[in-house]
């Protein structure tokens, strides 16, 4: 199996054009944060499945869809690409160089308390629980909320604090993966939970820009080739 290695703000995904199984994913993923399985494509559209490191499937990934769009754009030259993940679609616009803007829908729920932590739920095609606290607490708060009974299908967790009017610092605990360097849908979730309509989300892996307009979010970040790896499924 030949895999190309991409990264988006430190979030690493492998891209595979072959059909995968959970076992193959666990065997091949290595130190990446997941694998993007290409299930179909045209000049300006691509359909993918997003595999987590534990062999489970994710409903959505902002960084993953951005990588998929750039991967296709490098081959076809398309400047606007629709990325399909299950029933959802993300429109991605190439901005020049490694920069890509994506448009995604989001919805903020009612705040709650779980495992002693107050959180704001946000749906960005996948579930998020945003906690306003010191991001250094992610390894305590993340696993406590991810598997809490309040979230029967588990949840992604963000621990964030506002640095100024235009900057929020955050760390991410992704369900089925653990802590990651950044997350695109997490950036949207954090901005939405904080009510910040035009803001930079600062992750350990780099910054993402989020602009909210009604129920739509516009996420801008990079996607770049990291390296290549090869192997074969068991």
Q: What is each model feature region?
A:
Residues 105-118, 138-143:
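Active-site glycine-rich loop that binds ribose-phosphate moieties when present
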């Amino acid at each position: 199996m030949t895999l190309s290695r991409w990264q988006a703000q430190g979030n690493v995904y492998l891209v595979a054009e072959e059909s995968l199984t959970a076992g193959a994913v666990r065997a091949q993923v290595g130190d990446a944060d997941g694998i993007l399985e290409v299930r179909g494509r045209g000049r300006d559209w691509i359909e993918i499945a997003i595999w987590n490191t534990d062999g489970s499937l994710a409903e959505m990934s902002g960084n993953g869809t951005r990588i998929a769009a750039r991967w296709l754009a490098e081959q076809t030259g398309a400047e606007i690409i629709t990325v399909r993940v299950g029933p959802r679609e993300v429109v991605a616009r190439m901005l020049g160089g490694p920069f890509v803007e994506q448009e995604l829908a989001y919805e903020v729920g009612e705040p709650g308390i779980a495992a002693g932590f107050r959180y704001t739920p946000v749906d960005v095609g996948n579930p998020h629980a945003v906690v306003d606290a010191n991001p250094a607490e992610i390894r305590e708060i993340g696993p406590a909320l991810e598997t809490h009974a309040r979230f029967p299908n588990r949840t992604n967790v963000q621990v964030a604090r506002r640095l100024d009017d235009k900057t929020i610092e955050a760390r991410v605990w992704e369900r089925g993966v653990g802590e990651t360097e950044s997350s695109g849908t997490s950036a949207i979730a954090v901005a939405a939970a904080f009510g910040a309509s035009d803001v930079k989300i600062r992750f350990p892996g780099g910054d993402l820009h989020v602009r909210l307009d009604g129920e739509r979010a516009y996420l801008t970040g990079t996607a770049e080739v990291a390296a290549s790896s090869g192997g074969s499924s068991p």
